[in-house]
Regions:
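PLP-dependent amino-acid enzyme catalytic core
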Residues: 1-306
Length: 306
């Protein structure tokens, strides 16, 4: 797989990636840095633009989408990216989404023309994945089942773009990489690249602290019924568990004190990053800012200080 753009690709596809690293202000007496990779500045508003572009590119190059719709399960962001990038390339998209996905995410899917299949909210993305598999099994000639949780193009997206960008932007000074984990593609691809460049780098995965949580898109890997096939548990040096309450509080703090409006999963990742610099005053921590808090404005009660 190759991340380089092809001549046939829509101009919108070429706008994905090369997002900035934004500093989070810390105590000036410390030498540590926390740098937020602003993935919400991708054209579709999330890190999943990289994943969707890579999967679409791979499928188109292999002829998988000739006369077929792209089908996948998503908590919202990958589905939005498929729909947006698919619209630019003339690819029709069907997305299975848990019914508790935020109204903003569901609205964006419809605006971009995706067919949306809502699944049981209590079953989360596991249930959405099961429904997508069922749909594909019933009409395999109509759909290409992308299956982002097992598609190698997911990892390739980050190995070929996110990782090299971070390495270049930090001039190799990065000491810790932090990413929230759902499909785990961001950690596997970016972390794998960075580990090859700098074997002593610390890779920190972030997951909810409970199977019942409010962090859309993330998995509690120990209890999920469908562990991502992409996940290599030997790659992260540690996995930090963050509660929904701490993630929410951190996202609110970022909005009010830095102007960075990020979603709940990014709040969880930043909380884990801040824990690192409390213990390691010389660390250079890069954390993935997965998406924008604008995707969750309907959860206004979570944004209000309690």
């Amino acid at each position: 797989m190759n991340a380089e753009p092809r001549g046939w690709e829509p101009a919108l596809w070429r706008a994905v990636g090369n997002t900035p690293l934004l500093p989070i202000a810390l105590d000036a007496s410390r030498g540590a840095q926390v740098l937020l990779k602003a993935e919400w500045l991708n054209p579709g508003g999330s890190v999943k633009d990289r994943t969707a572009r890579s999967i679409l590119r791979d499928a188109l190059c292999r002829g998988e989408l000739a006369g077929r719709r792209l089908l996948d399960a998503s908590s919202g962001n990958t589905g939005i990216a498929y729909a947006m990038l698919g619209a630019a390339a003339g690819v029709e998209v069907t997305i299975c989404v848990p019914a508790n996905a935020s109204p903003e995410r569901r609205a964006l899917l419809e605006i971009y023309g995706a067919e949306v299949v809502l699944t049981d909210r209590l079953e989360g993305t596991d249930g959405a994945t099961e429904r997508a598999r069922q749909i594909f099994g019933e009409e395999p000639d109509r759909y290409y089942f992308a299956d982002q949780y097992s598609n190698p193009a997911n990892i390739a997206a980050h190995r070929e773009t996110t990782g090299p960008e971070i390495w270049s932007q930090t001039a190799g000074r990065i000491t810790h990489f932090v990413a929230a984990m759902g499909t785990t593609g961001t950690m596997m691809g970016t972390g794998g690249f960075l580990k090859e460049k700098k074997p002593d780098i610390r890779l920190i995965g972030v997951q909810p602290d409970s199977p019942l949580h409010g962090l859309e898109g993330l998995k509690h890997l120990a209890t999920t019924g469908h562990p991502p096939a992409l996940y290599n548990p030997g790659l992260p040096d540690a996995v930090a568990e963050v509660s929904t309450e701490v993630a929410d509080r951190t996202a609110r703090w970022l909005a009010r004190h830095t102007g960075y409006l990020v979603g709940w999963s990014a709040g969880a990742a930043v909380a884990a990053a801040l824990d690192i610099v409390r213990e390691e005053p010389d660390a250079c921590v890069v954390v993935i800012g997965c998406d924008s808090g604008a995707r969750y404005l309907s959860d206004l009660h979570r944004w209000r200080v309690t």
